[in-house]
Amino acid sequence: MRSRVNERFRKAFDSLPEDIQRRARAAYARWEQDPSHPSLQLKKVHDKHPIYSVRIALGWRAVGILQGEDMIWFWIGSHAEYDRLLAQLRR
């Protein structure tokens, strides 16, 4: 499975604290080696669409949509923002 990011993700990533950016890069490296690695806590977060989340660090998540063999990461942020995003996606 390949991984890509969109512009929205890039902008959100750039606004993260440096420590979280480092952790996100480490999570990405883990994902490249094994998307099902337990530390990523990969889970499907939408009933109808192939939308998944992974854990970046305690209190931080990334969200993407699976399109064929590509995971398109479109969001990254704090867990509080993640909860709000999921509420919007599930409407």
How would you describe each model-predicted region?
Residues R2-R4, I56-R91:
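Enriched for short, Lys/Arg-rich terminal
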